[in-house]
C-alpha cells in the first residue's frame, strides 16, 4: 500500500501554536475524502500503528504529540448542506470535519447566519472544538457541543458512523467530547442562528466591586467575561448583547499595536528571566496603558461589532494555560482565596502570575425538551439547542438544574477561571508553584480541569509509570487519573466502554501515556 496516495508524507514536524511541544510523526496525512480517511485507518490497523488527528494545534498541552501517524483534515473543509427551519429562526449547516471556524463564519455570513457562541479564537477546526469541550462565556449558552445536531465519524474499525440523539446516542455522547479517542469527525451538523451584531460595554471596575456584585453580575447580560489584574486590584468587565444597531469602530488596543506588543513582551521577558519581582509593576504599567486607572462602572466605552469580532479576542503571545470550571456558587470563595494567595506569594517572592486572569461562565444545564423557537428573532437571548445530551466527559458541574432564561441564577452556572503564564519570545517561564496552588484551590471548590489545557496534576493522582517528582520538568503534566475517576464516575466508565467498542485495536491511542496518567484508559489497555 502506497501511503503517499492518501496525501502521506514524511519528515513533517508538528508544533502546537504555543510552541511548547513538537513531534516528528512517522507519517503525516492530509486526506481529502471520507474514503481516504477510512483507508488510512485500515492501513494503521494493518501495520499496528496509532493515529492522532490535529487541526490548528491550539491546545497548549502535549495530548497530540506522537511519533507514529498524524492526520490533518484541512483539505476536508467543504459545505455539505444548509437547511433553514420553516420559520427561519435557525438553520442546520453541515460541513466537513476539518473546516476551520473562520471559513464557517464566512460561509454563514454569506447566508445571513452565525454560530451561537464562540470562544476566544476562530483558527480551530470544527472537529477540534467539538472534541475538546470548547465554550464561550455566557449565563445562557454552554459548550459548542450543545449546538451539534449530528456527527459523522470514522471509528477505529474503519466504519463510518452517523451519530445523533437517536442514532447511537451512547457513541454520540462520547464523540461530542471525545479527546480524539472515539473516532475521527469527518462531518458535523451545527445549529446556527440568524446573524447578529454584538453591542459590548467595557468597564474598569475594582476587584472589590466584582465581589460585591457577584450574585447579580453574571446574569446581567447574555455574554459576559472578566479580565482580572490582581496586582492592580482592578478588573475589566466586558458585557455584550445582541443588536441590529450598525457596527462602529473597534476599540483601540495599545498592546495590539506593533510597538506596544513588542514592548509588553520585552517587559515580560525581563520580569520572567532577569528580575521576577518586577512583574507587579509591569502589570500596573500595562493596565494603565491599555485601560487607564479610573473605575468606569456604568459609563464604560461601547463598541458594536459583528458577532465573531465581538466573541474573539487577541490572545497575545505563546502561553501556558490552565483552565478549570467549578460551580459559580463557590466563586466568591475561590476568588478571595486566589487573591490572598497571589498577594502572599508576591510578598514572599515565591511566585508571580501573568495577566489577565480570565474569569468566564457558561450554562451547560439542559432542558428535558426542546424549547419553543417560533417566537425568536435574531436578537433573542439564549440558545437553540442542537441536542439535549450531556457529553460524558463534560468537565462542568453535573449537579446544576436547568432553568428557563428568565429564571437563571448563579446556581445554574459554571465558573471558568483561566490561569495564564506567557512564554515571552517563546522562552519558558516557571508555572508549577502557581498552577499547583490554582488547581488545589479550584479542586477544593468542586472544580475540574479543561481537558485540552496545561493542567499539571500530581504524582499522587497519576496511574501507570510515574517518575520521582524531581525528574519532572517544571511545566510537565504529572496526571489526574485518580481524581478523574472520582469526578466522572459512571460516565467515565461508559466512555471507556464506548471507546473500547469503537476502537478495539487502540488506533486512536497515540500518546497513550497522556490518556493513561489522566485515567482515560485503564493500565491493562
Swiss-Prot record:
Biological processes per GO annotation: cellular response to oxidative stress; dehydro-D-arabinono-1,4-lactone biosynthetic process; mitochondrion inheritance
Positions bearing Pros-8alpha-FAD histidine: 58
Recorded metabolic or biological pathway in which this protein acts: Cofactor biosynthesis; D-erythroascorbate biosynthesis; dehydro-D-arabinono-1,4-lactone from D-arabinose: step 2/2
Enzyme class: oxidoreductase
Domain FAD-binding PCMH-type as annotated: residue spans: 20-195
Keywords, sorted A to Z: FAD, Flavoprotein, Membrane, Mitochondrion, Oxidoreductase
Listed GO CC annotations: cytoplasmic side of mitochondrial outer membrane
Enzyme Commission designation: 1.1.3.37
Gene3D superfamilies: 3.30.465.10, Uridine Diphospho-n-acetylenolpyruvylglucosamine Reductase, domain 2
Entry cofactors: FAD
Keyword check for Iron: no
Catalysis performed (reactions): D-arabinono-1,4-lactone + O2 = dehydro-D-arabinono-1,4-lactone + H2O2 + H(+)
InterPro entries in UniProt: ALO_C, FAD-bd_PCMH, FAD-bd_PCMH-like_sf, FAD-bd_PCMH_sub1, FAD-bd_PCMH_sub2, FAD_lactone_oxidase-like, Oxid_FAD_bind_N, Oxy_OxRdtase_FAD_BS
Example of a GO MF term: D-arabinono-1,4-lactone oxidase activity
Protein localization: Mitochondrion membrane
Transmembrane segments: none
Recorded family membership: Belongs to the oxygen-dependent FAD-linked oxidoreductase family.
NCBIfam families: FAD_lactone_ox
Annotated protein name in UniProt: D-arabinono-1,4-lactone oxidase
Protein's organism: Candida glabrata (strain ATCC 2001 / BCRC 20586 / JCM 3761 / NBRC 0622 / NRRL Y-65 / CBS 138) (Yeast)
Encoding gene per record: ALO1
